[in-house]
Amino acid sequence: MRFRHHVALATLIFSSLVASMAMAGVPVQWSVDVHAPIYNPPRVADGVVYFDTAQSKGPNVFSAKNGKILWRFMTGGTVLMPLTVGHGQVWVASDVGSTHYLRAIEAKTGKLIWDYTRHEPPECMCSHLTHYEHHLLFAQTDGHSLYAFYPVGNIPNRRLWAFTGDGAKLTAPVVVDHTVIFGSADHSIYGLFDKTGKIRWQQKTGYGFMAQPAVWKHEVIIGNRGGIVHAYSTTTGTTLWNFTTNGPINTTALIWHDSAFIASGAGDRGVYALSAKTGKQLWYTRMADYTAYAPVMAKQILVVASQDGNILGLSAKTGKILWRSELHGIPKSQPVLWKGDAVLKVNDHKIMAFNAQSGGLVWTYHSKNVVTSPVPKDDSVYVGTSGGTLVAIGQ
């Protein structure tokens, strides 16, 4: 199926701050009605907001400053995951029936640079899309395959290599020391040579992995569904240390200085601080309920959202609870930092911001529709809604 490139959107309505007075106390800078649901979080880079809608089926590109449209690209299919931006390109994965596309679009103009097409049964082509400094693009497909692409340059063979597992779902990869590292539901963690995709090392454990690995120096740290935290050499896969918790680990470790902070799941309901070098426990703080999202660090305060409807600030050095604030709902996203505040999605219709040092509520954005996870960038926090509104919140 061919696609169309639109430069203008005739039905676009720009809503001013005055039209948003129903959200009293929320510093809305601008909002744009695009008349189509926005389900994936937007991406923001170089003063531009990129997002897709259920009807546009491709990138919509707006000025981050004032919400005016810059260009629009129609893929002709269903967008499968949030857009990825880098190296002056926008990457979008989409499908039409049994045909799967991965396209690179010029970020400034909306011009198609290249596309990769694949034909097979209609299932999710892409669940993770990432890039790194060596200009390789990795797309995880079908839940068990990993592809590498050259995203830049005029070359005839865009795809570099492909890794296919045994059908088990893979985590998002990290790239360090020329090694592509990821966990798998087949109970293994893999390290691949980044230029060839061949297995550099593989470690088998007793449980599957769900979360992306974290990196500390030349060490990769990852927890599994059995509650065990593993640390491996990035180049050899040698086991450096193991630490056992009492609950499944479904989130990525937070690395801060020489410490790794681990959120343990149901059955444990706590946060561990471990030495990244030795795996020694530094402290453990039990909470009223587990956290489904990784914590974030704000000036030596660890901010954690708990499934019991609270957000907490812990001392990074001791684990002591410094503050606790009610969400009046269930957290639906990892907290993100913006101008000293911890911002997160609560339930399906609310974005809340708390002072990361004191826990005080700063503002709450309410929507009649389901909102995306918040995306902070520079002077604004960007949110899309299922009602077709893109909102920029800022001071």
What are these regions (language model features)?
Residues 25-39, 50, 57-58, 68-75, ...:
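Aromatic (tryptophan-biased) beta-strands that constitute blades/sheets of beta-rich domains
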Residues 20-22, 269:
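Residue-level detector of intrinsically disordered terminal segments
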Residues 8-20:
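Bacterial N-terminal signal peptides
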Residues 35-59, 77-103, 120-147, 163-190, ...:
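Repeat-blade elements of multi-bladed beta-propeller folds
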Residues 1-6, 395:
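Positively charged n-region of N-terminal signal peptides that target proteins for export
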Residues 63-66, 106-109, 150-155, 193-197, ...:
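Short loop/turn segments that connect beta-strands within beta-propeller blades
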